[in-house]
Amino acid sequence: MWLFALLVTLFYGVEGSIYLPQKLYGEVTSPLYPKPYPSDLETTTVITVPMGYRVKLVFWQFDVEPSEGCFYDYVKISADKQTLGRFCGQLDSPLGNPPGSKEFMSQGNKMLLTFHTDFSNEENGTIMFYKGFLAYYQAVDLDECASQPNSVEEGLQPRCQHLCHNYVGGYFCSCHPGYELQKDGQSCQAECSSELYTEPSGYVSSLEYPQPYPPDLRCNYSIRVERGLTVHLKFLDPFEIDDHQQVHCPYDQLQIYANGKNLGEFCGKQRPPDLDTSSNAVDLLFFTDESGDSRGWKLHYTTETIKCPQPKALDEFTIIQDPQPQYQFRDYFIVTCKQGYQLMEGNQALLSFTAVCQNDGTWHRAMPRCKIKNCGQPQSLSNGDFRYITTKGVTTYEASIQYHCHEPYYKMLTRAGSSESMRGIYTCTAQGIWKNEEEGEKMPRCLPVCGKPVNPVTQKERIIRGQPARPGNFPWQAFTTTHGRGGGALLGDRWILTAAHTIYPKHHNKENDNANPKMLVFLGHTNVEQIKKLGHHPVRRVIIHPDYRQDEPNNFEGDIALLELENSVTLGPELLPICLPDNETFYGQGLMGYVSGFGITEDKLAFDLRFVRLPVADSEACQRWLQTKKDTSPFSQNMFCSGDPAVQQDACQGDSGGVFAVRDRNRDIWVATGIVSWGIGCGEGYGFYTKVLNYVDWIKKEMGDEN
């Protein structure tokens, strides 16, 4: 027994108080738990949690010698200078006074557990062993602001003079409006010199209302709401401010200001009328003297959004979208125009218009006007013109014009299937753009009319020798000078069809030729002297067919070339293009054609354009004739011949490059079926021509298929 007592002493130290470390939770046990506790012992365990918390204790195991009144062994729980209970026995046992599952709670942050045992644990002469107890504790938030009638521990009852606010682990104090918390953090003192209200509505009152207000006040209540709102004041009953029957408000008074203007000074028992301040900034100044017992005043303030004037259109074409019965601050309206009209702000065109009601009751933009859309002067049409269908010179919305080409020399290009009635008609649209119903914004094009001479050749009898051409007989005729005289024919309005050998002659050494020989092209007259006076047309590009071989003197295969002029020419009665062939019928034996040129006639240079009428000859006859002349020049499928050996008529030197022109009677157009290429002598037999039909695809490809 002595040794057991010694071990207890070594384990617990001396009897007395045991202070547990301050924590938010933990456990408490009897000495040596779960082994039997020693005899003749008394210890007090002190449980402490942080300030602002209470201690909650629950027993999980309890096995202490039972006795009536827990006289021998017991556990005593104390807190806040009060005993919460004295316990012994076993849990769930009727003997003694076990704590069961009861929760023990302190009011402060401290709790004491005193464990007492007597000198022995005997029952009917038998020594009994008891395990003791196991308990858990935890910190629980203390609501310092709640009523604590049983708390006697100093410092637990909060001393907030006005308002108390609890939080986990503590509390803080605050004051009623118009009072200021003092340095002690608990007491409040009247302070209303700068009270600010910013909500759109609320209540304002004197201090302690409806109880008498304090003396010696100098209060300033400021209402500041968002710009664009106006403040309305409505005073409530009761309204009591000390006054005097003979002198107006000599003691206490309430002054109201809005926008720096004094709206009145009020006192007595008659509440002021409702006030519309027309301002978003209102100040209420309340002054009191050192005495009085009036109950003061209270008001309810509300706000209303400021209004802007109703928008009004400046003209009949202006549309105000979704008009409202009234417009307030931040409301807006949108303006559009009737179709065909443009929004205008001063001289500036607008894509859209929105005006916003400002906080001063004005619109942030002035109302615009609607001006009729103007498409402007119609574009000029190359080789054409236009006329006004509607009022002349008017180019505004719904105005109409019609383009036309300079006929009969040009015709208008339109898409397939387009309506004849809408051809060239353009209307000024609501977008301010000239537009055709079928072509859209795309401008029409005037294309040259080919093969329609104004004064065509009408001679039907055979011509024995060439004769002078009259103006307009062969308006496609070109006069060229490169290595001497040559001819050509106008295609479209900026291309010349000619023979390649007029540019790169067979008898010239190619190495001595310039890469770009000087080409002079003349058009528009039948007289050499006059045609030169009209001036030459600069050549932008020379295109030789790839089959042409300059270095093979007797081979005229591919003897065809195109000259692209720098500028398009203006067509007229003496300057018109010729058409290209589209079928083999133009090459039937005996079909008559015309060859024109400024070449040699009767061994002399011609100064006037001359022409000759020739039949298409039989190819086999031409081949046999060449054999009789012992000429080895190739006569291929890309060539044809014309003339009659029995009749001395033919193209001659200087006519090269000119065309063999045939009239298509079905379409009443003239077609260039051949190009004067080569022959033997002048007027001594057949002449040989480049067959244009075989080169039409190449021609169109090089010209871009634009004519």
From Swiss-Prot:
Known EC number: 3.4.21.41
Residue positions, PTM (3R)-3-hydroxyasparagine: 166
Annotated coiled-coil segments of the chain: none
Activity regulation as described: Activated by the C1Q subcomplex of the C1 complex following C1Q binding to immunoglobulins (IgG or IgM) complexed with antigens to form antigen-antibody complexes on the surface of pathogens. Immunoglobulin-binding promotes autoactivation of C1R, which results in the cleavage of the Arg-Ile bond in the catalytic domain.
Gene Ontology cellular component terms for the protein in this record: extracellular region
Top EC class of this enzyme: hydrolase
Family: Belongs to the peptidase S1 family.
Name of this protein: Complement C1r-A subcomponent
Classification lineage: Eukaryota, Metazoa, Chordata, Craniata, Vertebrata
Gene: C1ra
